[in-house]
Amino acid sequence: MADLPTYEYEEKLRSKGYSTIAGVDEVGRGPIAGPVYAAAVILNPNHIPVGLNDSKKLSAKKRTLISEEIMKHADVSIGSASEREIEEINILRASHLAMMRAIEGLKSTPNHVLIDGNLVPRDLTIPAIAIVRGDARSVSIAAASIMAKTSRDLLMCDLGQQFPGYGWDKNAGYPTKQHLNALQDLGVTPHHRRTFKPVHNILYQE
């Protein structure tokens, strides 16, 4: 049980007077196709879903079930940054832009934010702390990781139907062997990130 995320960070903040705490996480920094997604989640301390964990440690079925529980009782917002925005401002800044959009979309304005990673978005004016491996340590960040991943996976499945052959329903845009082979055979789609090396190399090969 020690490996499961806890409510410890949130409890400490609540004891200091912070009543509305959002967990924030992103997904999709590594893919060569599709936008980057982020989720912001304010959990109800009286309704924390059982089994919350880092989304990468859960099966797709389990993620879906827990995401439905999160939606019932929590304030949830999804933000994204497009492939073109990723190309223009780089993936780190685009990830932070998606996080900012997710936070701004919450129904309630949080008075403290817990962010997965080691950097707080520079434009965020709300008090915040970055927690390395936060999705495995804080239930609020774990909830955000689940919501971000389930939302982005759904989008990539939809895009995969529009652009068959790349396997996006399975690889979510990550550079798997199937995806890279399809990139060579079928070419670059509007949803590929043109500044990412495998895509850039095909576009500008001699």
Regions found by a protein language model. Give the residues of each.
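RNase H-like, Mg2+-dependent phosphodiesterase core
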Residues: 1-206
